[in-house]
A protein has these predicted regions:
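A domain-level signal for the structural core that forms small-molecule/cofactor-binding pockets
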Residues: 1-142
Length: 142
């Protein structure tokens, strides 16, 4: 149930670019971090290359692409190896979509506490406890 924000900059243009990015991010998040794509939310935003600076120069000036991915997941649900594999796979796939990437391209796996994070009006901790008690999460809230 991650919430993922993708900001990107590229000179490549395609009517399906944002959908391609969202699809790739969803696929790798499911495959490597084991997150259910049916409860994954992805926001994709384009940033003009003249407005993105890395290493002191704009991406437009350097003729390079970049992205910033911020993914929120429940704390302790992924290993260090999974997170490292996710960053590496994402860098490779996003380069295929966006073109040559600036070395200063970032991804942040933000591990948040289950009692402070959730969706549909319920925290992840409440869902976890309800699952252990074998009751519906909304009934556990009553």
């Amino acid at each position: 149930m991650p919430l993922i924000t993708v900001s990107y900059s590229t000179s490549r243009q395609s009517p399906s670019l944002k959908a391609d990015i969202a699809s790739t991010v969803s696929e790798l998040t499911a495959k490597i971090l084991h997150k259910d794509p049916t409860v994954t939310a992805i926001i994709v935003k384009s940033v003009d290359a003249n407005d993105w600076f890395a290493g002191g120069k704009s991406l437009a000036e350097q003729k390079l692409a970049s992205y910033w991915i911020d993914i929120h997941v429940s704390e302790g649900t992924n290993t260090k190896d999974e997170k490292a594999a996710y960053l590496a796979a994402m860098f490779k796939r996003m380069a295929e979509i966006l073109g040559p990437l600036h070395h200063e391209t970032y991804l942040h796996v933000d591990e948040v506490r289950g009692d402070a994070y959730g969706f549909g009006g319920l925290t992840q901790e409440r869902r976890y406890i309800a699952g252990k008690l074998e009751v519906a999460p909304d009934r556990a809230a009553a």
